[in-house]
Amino acid sequence: MIIGSNPATVGFTNNFISKYQPIGIIQQSGGPEGDGFVEIKDINSKPKFQSSGNNIAEDVLGEVYDNIYVDNPSDVIHFKVPKGRLNKDEELKRQIKEMNVDIIISHGPERIGTEIISMAKYGGINIHWGLSPTYKGTHTVRWPLLHEKPEWIGVTIHKLDRNLDTGPILYQAKPDLQTDWSYRHIEYSLTKLSYDIVPKAMEEVLSGKSDVVNQDLSEGKTYFSKEYTEECESKLNNEYVSKQIENYLS
């Protein structure tokens, strides 16, 4: 698995590896100096998805995401890679090659180069929080809200290719939005959706029986971090998010 360090990504990983134990976890930091890692902790009393309902209290979500971490069973190799170094670290690539990987599961912030993808027997799949091809790149859950189009919030599971979020689509899913949700509720629901559909996509790729839909790359846009400003972030308060969902559902 290749993951980032934001709590939602780590939350997905924590639950995923409790059932599907990977050979190794490559965790990218939030910054180029290796800062921003969610630290590995003891596996005792690990937090789990705490509710299957829609009306999840904000404080419960805060507890889940503020205290969640990646389990690291003793036989799972764990690498930490500073942001921007994934495709440049020759020692890391050597170790990946030696692990004889079947498939790469990606849920991280950095594009994975073809050299690493080719090291896995069946290539890789990416968990993209956004509905490709309309919303590719970064912050693609926030942009639909800023565009007042919450109907475009969802998850895309696609095969990895050399570009950013452009690979053939295996699965897409949308959350059942509720009018009393904050952005954190949306994030939580996407984590659960990902956990439900990634194993299906993984098994299909491994069995060679996957049905894919090629993306029409003439549609939509690829968004980059520099476009998402502090002004954008300040706009997405609970009242704004709830209002966008209410307008969509009415």
Residue ranges and their predicted role:
Residues 1-250:
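One-carbon transfer enzymes
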